[in-house]
Amino acid sequence: MIDPAFLSREYNNRELFPDYARHFARWQDGSARARSTMSCALDRAYGASPGETLDVFPARKGDGSALVFIHGGYWRSLDKRDFSFLAPAWVDAGVSLVVVNYGLCPNVTLERIVQQMLAASAWLYRHAEGYG
């Protein structure tokens, strides 16, 4: 049996990187800036639950490519709004960025999160043309 303390050390980046709050603050600042200065469609519902939303940062040029970003947090923390800071680099490169939110554990199961990602993918398939 694997020691739970070992797993916690290996999978909890907040324990591995004690200055994580500084990085999170930088992400929040960059994300707020991206949402306030860039063309974007925020909080588009792909499902009925409050957490089933996504943000679209459409590219102004390019071939219609899109990157779908599913935020980290080990299924139990963080939010799509924490990762809007990624948008400027992708949009400037001609790639639309879609940042997807999902329900967090323990309020939902991992199986439900997989279902949410399938629903988000289906929504994107149906609506992608409207975002270039």
Protein language model regions, located:
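Glycine-/small-residue-rich active-site loops that bind phosphorylated ligands and cofactors
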Residues: G62, W75, C105
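A fold-wide structural signal in alpha/beta-hydrolase
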Residues: A66, V91-V98, G103
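Short beta-strand element of the alpha/beta-hydrolase
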Residues: D63-G73
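N-terminal cap/lid segment of alpha/beta-hydrolase-fold proteins
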Residues: F6-G62
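Catalytic nucleophile-loop/oxyanion-hole region of alpha/beta-hydrolase
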Residues: L78-L86, V98-G132
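Short glycine/proline-enriched loop/turn "hinge" motifs that connect secondary-structure elements
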Residues: R60, P88-D92
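Basic/polar N-terminal segments that are highly enriched at the extreme N-terminus
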Residues: M1-D3
